[in-house]
């Protein structure tokens, strides 16, 4: 096991009455100023959640302002609007109500409010944040794990880039997690979330450092649990309210555990699939989970001979495949089992299923060049990928 630092300071309130703790948590972590309530749109309003939050804040004496309309693959322009609003209103805490896109936007706004330049500087590696507005979360879409992670991912529409920035400074101060809030999610969002949750662990599971026995066992347990829970929710019939709650609770907590470095540290993680997907969703604005499902099998087949035993473990211990004694065949069977799982959940495999058409060679080369930053950056720890490798994986998915 390698040496590591583990820092996860987010206070989590998990459970069916977790929303009742909101006023106390806001009081505990808010700086001087108003609360900015940040949210996406429809479901938060239709469910009455936004009204309940506003009532709690008002009755507790907190001044607040609202900003809605946060979209999937959150935009830099919206971050800029949020920064301007924070300067104008004097915001002391950002309350993100929603999923990863809302939380990522909140983190970016927090960083940018205390920075004289463009917040995009953090994402292109030009600067590092020195302060931020505290962020709190009311989670409604378990997927990205941003409620506990140090990550934020933002899309720049002008440059057609989707980039991440990681900083412990931006970790949410608290996360309120009520699995009932995820009951009304459409199947597509549930499936995208399950793919993303599993992928955050798979990016850490497929590593060259296979002597991390505890992390490996934890990862396999999490992957099995999410797969089985998603199968119940998406493929089961006449699921009882109790069984639905059990499955939704497991997925919501797995969302956080999968991306808080418990399953493996960043230094030993791969994340090439994430980097390649970011280029896809930057150009085509597809759901992140769907993009991951589309590209992962091609990555897996391209790199599996780096360590077949790891893929055999994945096949047998996660996907339930029988080991036939031939490592390559068993590894391939595990990848096919994952593809079958994606299809059961209504997720795409390959570009044709994701986009409705194949991608041109020109676009493949463009994405490979951007992903590798002109072949100066080679993502991947299980296998380091240069620009030609990345293009080859895109072609396999085509």
Where in this protein do the model-derived segments appear?
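A glycine/threonine-rich phosphate-anchoring loop and its flanking beta-alpha core
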Residues: 10, 114-217, 313
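Acidic-glycine-rich active-site phosphate/pyrophosphate-binding loop
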Residues: 80, 169-175, 266-274
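Glycine/serine-rich anion-binding loops at beta->alpha junctions
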Residues: 91-109, 140-146, 283-286
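ATP/NTP phosphate-donor binding region
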Residues: 1-93, 351-352
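Active-site segments that bind and position negatively charged phosphate/pyrophosphate groups
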Residues: 204, 208-337
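C-terminal charged capping/lid subdomain of soluble metabolic enzymes
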Residues: 311, 317-398
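Short Gly/Thr/Asp-enriched flexible loops that form oxyanion-binding sites at enzyme active sites
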Residues: 52-53, 83, 102-116, 148-149
């Amino acid at each position: 096991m390698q040496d590591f630092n583990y820092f996860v300071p987010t206070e989590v309130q998990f459970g069916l009455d977790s929303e009742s703790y909101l006023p106390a948590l806001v009081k505990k972590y808010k700086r001087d100023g108003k609360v900015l309530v940040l949210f996406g749109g429809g479901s938060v309003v239709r469910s009455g959640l936004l009204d309940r939050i506003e009532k709690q804040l008002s009755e507790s004496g907190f001044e607040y302002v609202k900003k809605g309309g946060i979209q999937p693959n959150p935009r830099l322009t919206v971050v800029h609007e949020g920064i301007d609003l924070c300067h104008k209103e004097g915001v002391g805490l950002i309350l993100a109500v929603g999923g990863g896109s809302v939380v990522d936007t909140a983190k970016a706004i927090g960083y940018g409010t205390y920075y004289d330049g463009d917040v995009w500087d953090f994402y292109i590696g030009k600067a590092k944040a020195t302060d931020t507005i505290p962020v709190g979360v009311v989670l409604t879409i378990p997927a990205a794990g941003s409620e506990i992670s140090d990550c934020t991912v933002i899309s720049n529409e002008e440059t057609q880039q989707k980039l991440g920035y990681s900083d412990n400074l931006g970790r949410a101060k608290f996360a309120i997690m009520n699995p009932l809030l995820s009951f009304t999610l459409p199947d597509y969002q549930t499936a995208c979330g399950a793919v993303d949750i599993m992928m955050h662990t798979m990016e850490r599971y497929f590593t060259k450092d296979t002597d991390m026995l505890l992390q490996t066992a934890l990862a396999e347990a999490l992957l099995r649990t999410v797969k089985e829970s998603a199968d119940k929710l998406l493929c089961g019939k006449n699921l009882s309210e109790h069984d639905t709650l059990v499955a939704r609770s497991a997925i919501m907590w797995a969302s956080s555990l999968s991306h808080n470095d418990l399953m493996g540290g960043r230094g030993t993680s791969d994340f090439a699939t994430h980097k390649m997907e970011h280029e896809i969703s930057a150009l085509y604005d597809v759901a992140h989970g769907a993009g991951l499902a589309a590209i992962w099998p091609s990555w897996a087949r391209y790199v599996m001979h780096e360590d077949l035993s790891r893929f055999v473990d994945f096949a047998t211990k996660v996907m339930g495949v029988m080991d036939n004694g031939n490592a390559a065949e068993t590894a391939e069977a595990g990848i096919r089992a994952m593809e079958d799982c994606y299809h059961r959940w209504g997720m795409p495999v390959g570009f044709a299923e994701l986009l409705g058409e194949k991608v041109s060679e020109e676009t493949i080369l463009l994405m490979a060049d951007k992903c590798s930053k002109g072949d100066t950056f080679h993502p991947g720890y299980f296998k380091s990928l240069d620009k030609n490798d990345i293009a080859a994986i895109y072609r396999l998915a085509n």
